[in-house]
Amino acid sequence: ASELARSRGKRAGVAVALSLAAVTSVPALAADTVVQAGETVNGGTLTNHDNQIVFGTANGMTISTGLEYGPDNEANTGGQWIQNGGIANNTTVTGGGLQRVNAGGSVSDTVISAGGGQSLQGQAVNTTLNGGEQWVHEGGIATVTVINEKGWQAVKSGAMATDTVVNTGAEGGPDAENGDTGQNVYGDAVRTTINKNGRQIVAAEGTANTTVVYAGGDQTVHGHALDTTLNGGYQYVHNGGTASGTVVNSDGWQIIKEGGLADFTTVNQKGKLQVNAGGTATHVTLKQGGALVTSTAATVLGSNRLGNFTVENGKADGVVLESGGRLDVLEGHSAQKTRVDDGGTLAVSAGGKATDVTMTSGGALIADSGATVEGTNASGKFSIDGISGQASGLLLENGGSFTVNAGGQAGNTTVGHRGTLTLAAGGSLSGRTQLSKGASMVLNGDVVSTGDIVNAGEIHFDNQTTQDAVLSRAVAKGDSPVTFHKLTTTNLTGQGGTINMRVRLDGSNTSDQLVINGGQATGKTWLAFTNVGNSNLGVATTGQGIRVVDAQNGATTEEGAFALSRPLQAGAFNYTLNRDSDEDWYLRSENAYRAEVPLYASMLTQAMDYDRILAGSRSHQTGVNGENNSVRLSIQGGHLGHDNNGGIARGATPESSGSYGFVRLEGDLLRTEVAGMSLTTGVYGAAGHSSVDVKDDDGSRAGTVRDDAGSLGGYLNLVHTSSGLWADIVAQGTRHSMKASSD
């Protein structure tokens, strides 16, 4: 009533619509219009601060005014006002427009565009927010509102929204508190459907009941969420928020943050429950294939397929980890009877303790030699003694990793696919260390193995060999000091694995080194080198070269035990791997230059040959043929190349063979007779291409040089009239675009 009074006070009077018939058509409304009870108005537009006050029925109105003071401002007085008993159907609200539905009023099928709004204290059914906003005030009920991109529904305290469909709000990324799109609930929201990109934010005083969240959508809970179903969507429960009865289905994810509480959560196959430090989840039902992600700093109580489990007060008991599940046992905390199945991860920090662990195929263990862990895996019993730093029987796979700290030792370790074994300086190996295909061992210092290393995976020195270095043909930045390391082992059996080593090829002749101490190197191991020196300054090696494999104390290395995994080049040199009679292996520079050197040496000659042929082509056109045309077009092609005249080492042009072709257009500017001589001047332009195959000094193919050329020139032609003698003077400039491709 107060809003109506303000509306009426806006102008001197109110124009009352005539009610001569039950239905009145109003093609153009007056400034203020009242639709009386029992009256129906079809169509019309509200603009320029107009009012329509509806006690009867208004159909098909377009509203473009009313938000003079901004969104959801009680000072707004224009637009369409639906009063107690009033009805509005099929209304369109455009930018700047306002539809106000007071208590007792009802609207249906309203479409609100960006910049428009609906203020609701009555009832609204089938509202569509196409970038527009709906403000549901105390006592208001919004049913089946569809919130599309950039639309926003605010359900205030004492208000209710039912069967809302949310298609916007999450574009800012997971759990981003943007709050200006999607649905914000301060009152009650029932049976909300949240689709991809949709977001529902439940404020501290709000309640959301029976929400369904699909993939790409999420629900942020600061208040209360009841009976939410996550069908691929996410639910974030923040400090002070509670979620009860959540069902997490495939690809769904419930995250309980510090201070958040979840009760009676059910996690089905491929669903995930994450409880952060300080978060609480009680009465959890974890079905087979469901994932639990938590740490011993959280509180989680419930049941899994093996029975009841608990995580509280720094202790975990009976936890099952699979399908992306993870338990972090923190320093000073403990876990017992943990089962780690396929896709599960048990991470034990230094000072943490995990006993009676069962690791099955596909499970991952993450620890270092400062943790205490004992249990069984696919290979049998395993253990880590956090006091002595001794580990035995570890199986690392599927993201599992173990770090041997200084003074620690790992014995009889198996590293499977996607597993990593890291050794600090002073860490050591014993027994059999097996690296499967896809496994990694990282050496951060000098490491000694007193047993055997069997390698089908990757060994990295200081983890400096990256994919970027591989793509750049094993060249790394040389602007930081490098400390080279040694890996010493009794025996090495190569099973097609790779050892990634660092080397300086700019004169220092130093590298990481593999030492075979008293045993054998057998099988096949690839050596991949990263040049950590100045990649533009390759220096020829001296003596035997750079020793990279050192056979000591009677050790032997099979011929073919090592090979380069990729070309190694620096400056002008190629480097090869060679085995000497002392069983050691060395990097040596080749006497021949690397393939790129003859290619670049050939470029200048190729360009000059082309330029000379193009400039000389002028004589054949006019001097010999005596053409009189002022403009001439010619096409020419032929062979281009050089014989072997001693090679680069003797300063000669590399041997090459190829072809050229060009199109030339020239035009005379002046023709005249001077002192018995015919004088002609003109200009020309040409576009051409040449391609030459280049050979190295040893006769092998080095690659191909291709040249796209554009030329401009001028000429002066003199012909002695009586004798026929002639001369051409040519000035020419050419832009060459050359590309060398080595074999």
Task: Place the predicted regions along the sequence by residue.
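Fold-core signature of tandem repeat domains
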Residues: 41, 46, 52-54, 58-63, ...
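Bacterial Sec-dependent N-terminal signal peptides
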Residues: 1-17, 23
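Disulfide-bonded cysteine-rich modules in secreted/extracellular proteins
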Residues: 33-36, 129, 148, 230, ...
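Outer membrane beta-barrel translocator domains of Type V secretion systems
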Residues: 590-743
